């Protein structure tokens, strides 16, 4: 892509100054429309070492209210980031609606650098490319404007800048080992950058190659391209996004009405199995920590189905230093202002740890769908987006265990009445629970569709028959133990 690219003819200085003034004024006005229309803008600034990425960002942000933007310089990974999925450090930095985030280098720089230094196999590189394509598409599908710039300078220009920076003691620190390596292997790096850009150049998030030999000319190209992108985003905001066909292998699942709910276990047998299974799970927890295997256990189910008690029996077997339970309620304002998966990306476990979710990302295709908190296009896209999210976690090495806790309508009513009539349990019942119960049939339809469309081979659903809560607890423990034994051997 770089080899075929031709730089635009640089205008005269007077024209550059006039166009710069116009572009700056335009961006200053557009930022108010971005805030008003709640469009999040992610600007990725990539390019050669010493091409001036930081300087360009510094010039652009002078035209934006400081309350509306954030600049992130993506250096080396932190220890925590090394123990999270590849996209974690980028997903957690996406902007809120109505705001800008500027990334000084990002996922392109990381992938190409790892490839050039032999840290990625061909298979891993291909997976990273696919991850990036999904990530960028999910953002743009959900209303984000993603602008990707590559600042390009010739080999001799880079060498000249390195020499100039190294000559002054106050600037020598700005020359990194990677800058020097790039210049020594310029052709190899150029080929790698070109290949990456070809593979990730998409209509919804194209690459913009910028002639970065002259500072003011570079600034003008970036500003004019950015304002054009914003203009298009403002006019296209309400367009529906085409739905993608599922490409992931699905596991056949029964409808909820087909699940027999007469499963029971005797109290003595329950106590015996509970002790044995919890002891075994405790042993496996130690092993998965040593082998650095991350585990994600996701719970969904009817209100009063017994999710809390089920989670309590699993958590009771674990070392408290190695797991966390996340009760998921309605999103906070800062969560609602971002991509709906953001609050789950930011709660993922480290390698060797367990995250247990009491309610999950599946709220998108249940409560958000039925209560009108998102559009029909949003929740219909979400099945594929969730399958992609879980595939990303699976490819990272996570064990994903998903439970639907099933009861019938009569059992729910019995438990609701018990909660309402027992003072120490009244906190468990809310008006919302009763409202949801009135929509039982609609929820059952949504849950059936959810299970059918998201029970993949790498993250299948497990239905827990929970009219007898003790039976459901033992079944859940058995499944968790079996899944961990498969991975740990």
Placement of each model-derived feature along the sequence:
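Glycine-rich phosphate-binding loop of ATP-dependent small-molecule kinases
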Residues: 1-489
């Amino acid at each position: 892509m770089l080899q075929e690219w031709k730089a635009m003819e640089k205008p005269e200085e007077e024209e550059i100054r006039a166009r710069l003034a116009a572009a700056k004024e335009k961006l200053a006005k557009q930022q108010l429309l971005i805030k008003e229309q709640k469009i999040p803008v992610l600007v990725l600034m990539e390019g050669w070492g010493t091409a001036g990425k930081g300087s360009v960002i510094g010039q652009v942000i002078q035209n934006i209210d400081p309350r509306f933007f954030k600049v992130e310089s993506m250096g080396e990974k932190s220890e925590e980031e090394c123990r999270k999925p590849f996209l974690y450090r980028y997903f957690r930095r996406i902007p809120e609606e109505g705001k800008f985030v500027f990334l000084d280098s990002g996922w392109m720089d990381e992938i190409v650098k790892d490839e050039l230094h032999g840290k990625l196999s061909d298979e891993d590189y291909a997976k990273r490319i696919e991850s990036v394509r999904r990530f960028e598409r999910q953002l743009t599908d959900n209303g984000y404007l993603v602008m990707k710039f590559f600042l390009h300078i010739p080999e001799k220009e880079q060498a000249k800048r390195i020499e100039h920076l190294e000559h002054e003691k106050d600037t020598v620190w700005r020359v990194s080992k990677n800058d020097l390596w790039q210049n020594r292997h310029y052709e190899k790096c150029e080929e790698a950058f070109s290949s990456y850009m070809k593979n990730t150049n998409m209509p919804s998030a194209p690459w913009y190659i910028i002639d970065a030999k002259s500072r003011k000319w570079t600034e003008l190209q970036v500003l004019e391209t950015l304002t054009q992108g914003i203009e298009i985003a403002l006019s296209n905001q309400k367009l529906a996004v085409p739905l993608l066909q599922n490409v992931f292998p699905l596991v056949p699942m029964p409808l909820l009405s087909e699940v027999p709910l007469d499963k029971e276990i005797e109290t003595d047998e329950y106590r015996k199995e509970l002790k044995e299974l919890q002891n075994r799970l405790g042993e496996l927890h130690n092993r998965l920590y040593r082998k650095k295997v991350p585990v994600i256990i996701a719970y969904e189910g009817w209100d009063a189905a017994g999710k809390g008690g089920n989670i309590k029996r699993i958590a009771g077997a674990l070392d408290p230093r190695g797991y966390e339970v996340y009760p998921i309620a309605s999103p906070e304002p800062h969560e609602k202002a971002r991509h709906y998966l953001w609050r789950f990306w930011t709660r993922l476990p480290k390698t060797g740890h367990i995250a247990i979710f009491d309610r999950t990302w599946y709220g998108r295709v249940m409560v958000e769908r039925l209560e009108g908190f998102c559009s029909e296009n949003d929740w219909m896209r979400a099945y594929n987006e969730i399958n992609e999210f879980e595939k990303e976690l699976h490819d990272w090495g996570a064990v994903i265990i998903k439970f639907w806790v099933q009861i019938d309508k009569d059992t729910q009513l019995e438990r609701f009445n018990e909660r309402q009539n027992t003072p120490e349990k009244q906190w468990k019942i809310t008006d919302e629970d009763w409202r949801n119960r009135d929509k039982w049939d609609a929820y059952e339809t949504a849950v059936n569709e959810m299970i059918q469309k998201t029970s993949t081979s790498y993250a299948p659903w497990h239905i827990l028959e929970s009219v007898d809560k003790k039976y459901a607890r033992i079944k859940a423990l058995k499944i968790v133990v079996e899944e961990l034994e498969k991975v740990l051997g």
